[in-house]
Swiss-Prot record:
Organism: Francisella tularensis subsp. mediasiatica (strain FSC147)
GO CC entries: plasma membrane
Self-association state and partner proteins as the record states: The system is composed of three essential subunits: KdpA, KdpB and KdpC.
Keyword Transmembrane helix: yes
Protein family membership: Belongs to the KdpA family.
GO molecular function, one term: potassium ion binding
Chain segments annotated as transmembrane: 6-26, 66-86, 135-155, 177-197, 257-277, 283-303, 382-402, 428-448, 493-513, 537-557
Keyword Ion transport: yes
Entry keywords, A to Z: Cell inner membrane, Cell membrane, Ion transport, Membrane, Potassium, Potassium transport, Transmembrane, Transmembrane helix, Transport
Protein name per its UniProtKB record: Potassium-transporting ATPase potassium-binding subunit
Pfam families: KdpA
Membrane topology category: Multi-pass membrane protein
Length: 573
């Protein structure tokens, strides 16, 4: 138990220590200031901008920025889709893997361009090396950079005033890849290789075991993809077992690096925001609220897994309980990680829009599974994905400012800018589109007989498997309850739709809000006379409960039919 507390404290301290330097670095990169990596990144950026031509030089309005973002995503989608369909005739296909069916290729392409990395295939048997490296790994970089671009555009809109432009998407995209994601990923990949993660393009090995049978050992360019998988909060595993596989996550060191890299950029953006708007206290308040939400989720999930079987009334279980004192849920977990390392990793991955797992979420207790769903359902705002976590949290921040200001009889304003009805329309659109998407698609799937046939469990847990899939898709997480066999035409298409709506619907609202904020006057006098201090402890509490009430209650009825009912059923076993 003491070792668990030490690990947790070390993890939190590490995140806190890297937040300021990495946040300052991100600020310098996007504010066109000199950095230590200019010598490495600038040559790539010059070539990239030369190819783009004039489109990369002019500042863009919100509509132009969004149009460029969508145009890029459409091109990326077509690129990935074609490779997945034709991978059977493309090079570097040592296992002679055939091209995907169109519905599965469509689902996978949408999944990777939206930074979701939902996988209805097994990586080691469903995708060739060529497709892994050129299609999926590349999207791990650029889809993360797209989210980062949106966050930076939003931050600019708060910092700027009385102008019409929020930056240039193409320029921001290059900076996100060449200055931030690529250099850090190279370092992480090298560390992974030294820790035993394979990095090659050799055919799978056929070995004879001591039992006299033949076993196929998969390998491939794993380290390079694993590095950006976590740093870019992508989560899609090279193997079906994801980070539970010893080739993806061989040691406690790689496990720790993956957890830190998942939160690194999301945490740093809180400081980037504070520094850019000239109020670092505001950034640290955001960091603090995120941290409290994370700790609560981790505590509930860990206690549920450590003591989740204590209440079962089976005589055999009670006999064991009498001998050992308590029963921990080790089903679906690697013995080398144990309960706490598993729950910590999965709390991190579901809090961020990562979706990587080092244990089987479907085998978690219903209460722990519910916490994983809640982490995603509130909009992935507990640090969240690269960029997406920050702009998702900012929507709740705007709502809290609006509610708090009206409660004390003041005109809503944030950092000297008046918050008006149009701003709140975009805010509520961003906050409600994903929950609506989840509830509609889950309700439809729950009454379709063909979906029932894909479930390995019935009743409340079967419903939880469906609910989890659409929560994960709409919030761009990508993790799953493995009891759902997702490779059907209906699930491939509807989950793809939920990923598209959850990603680009929210981004559209965020960029439109940025376009509104950037045009406003910034009155320091307005900020000073307002009695709503947005850096105070009271305001932090208001933001905290706004997230729980608005984010949590929208999905609570569905949770009542799934994991809550599942937990109550277990109590009476």
């Amino acid at each position: 138990m003491i070792s668990n507390f030490i690990l947790f404290a070390l993890f939190i301290v590490t995140i806190a220590l890297i937040t300021k330097p990495l946040g300052s670095y991100i600020f310098r990169v996007f504010n066109n200031e000199r950095t230590y990596l200019d010598w490495l990144a600038k040559p790539f950026q010059r070539v990239y901008l030369l190819v783009l031509g004039e489109s990369s030089k002019k500042e863009q309005t919100a509509k132009a920025y969004f149009f460029s973002l969508v145009s890029f995503s459409v091109m990326a989608f077509i690129f990935v889709l074609v490779i997945l369909l034709l991978q059977g005739i493309l090079p570097l296909n040592t296992q002679e893997i055939k091209g995907m069916s169109f519905p599965q290729a469509l689902n996978t392409a949408v999944s990777f361009i939206t930074n979701t990395n939902w996988q209805s295939y097994s990586g080691e048997t469903g995708v060739s090396y060529f497709a892994q490296m050129l299609a999926l790994a590349v999207q791990n970089f650029v889809s993360a950079a797209v989210g980062l671009c949106v966050a930076i555009a939003l931050i600019r809109s708060v910092a700027r005033h009385e102008t019409a432009t929020i930056g240039n998407f193409w320029n921001d995209l290059g900076k996100g890849v060449f200055w931030i994601l690529l250099p850090i990923s190279i370092v992480i990949a090298i560390v992974y290789i030294f820790q035993g993660v394979p990095q090659n393009v050799m055919a799978y090995l056929h070995v004879h075991t001591l039992a006299g049978t033949e076993q196929i050992i998969s390998q491939g360019p794993i380290a390079s993809q694993e590095a950006i998988k976590s740093l870019g909060t992508n989560g899609g595993g090279f193997f079906n077992a994801n980070s539970a596989h010893p080739y993806e996550n061989p040691t406690v060191i790689t496990n720790y690096i993956q957890m830190v890299s998942i939160f690194a950029i999301a945490a740093a953006l809180t400081y980037t925001f504070g520094k850019w708007v000239g109020n670092t206290k505001q950034g640290w308040l955001i960091f603090g609220v995120m941290l409290v939400l994370f700790i609560i989720s981790l505590v509930v999930m860990t206690i549920s897994e450590l003591h989740g079987l204590d209440f079962l009334h089976s005589k055999d279980i009670q006999d064991i309980y009498g001998q050992v004192g308590h029963l921990s849920n080790m089903e679906g977990k690697e013995s080398r990680f144990g309960v706490f390392y598993s729950t910590l990793y999965n709390t991190v991955s579901t809090s961020a829009s990562d979706g990587g797992v080092n244990s089987v979420l479907d085998s978690y207790s219903p209460l722990a599974g519910m916490m994983a769903m809640l982490n995603m359902a509130i909009g992935e705002v507990i640090f969240g994905g690269v960029g997406a976590g920050f702009y998702g949290f900012f929507m709740f921040l705007m709502l809290a400012v609006f509610i708090g200001s009206l409660m004390i009889g003041r005109a809503p304003s944030f950092l000297g800018k008046r918050i008006e009805a149009n701003d709140m329309k975009w805010t509520m659109f961003a906050l409600l589109i994903s929950p609506c998407c989840v509830l509609v698609f889950t309700g439809l799937a729950a009454v379709i007989p063909s979906v029932h046939q894909t479930l390995t469990n019935s009743g409340a847990h079967g419903f939880s498997e469906i609910l989890y899939a659409y929560i994960s898709g709409a919030n761009n997480n990508g993790s799953a309850f493995a009891g759902l066999s997702a490779n059907t035409n209906y699930l491939n298409i509807t989950i793809a739709l939920s990923m598209l709506i959850g990603r680009f619907g929210v981004i559209f609202a965020v960029i439109m809000l940025a376009g509104s904020l950037v045009k406003k006057k910034r009155s320091l006098q307005m900020s000073e006379i307002s009695s709503l201090d947005t850096t105070s402890f009271i305001f932090a509490i208001l933001v905290f409960f706004t997230i729980l009430l608005i984010g949590g209650l929208t999905i609570f009825p569905a949770l009542g039919l799934g994991p809550i009912l599942d937990q109550l059923n277990l109590n009476f076993l």
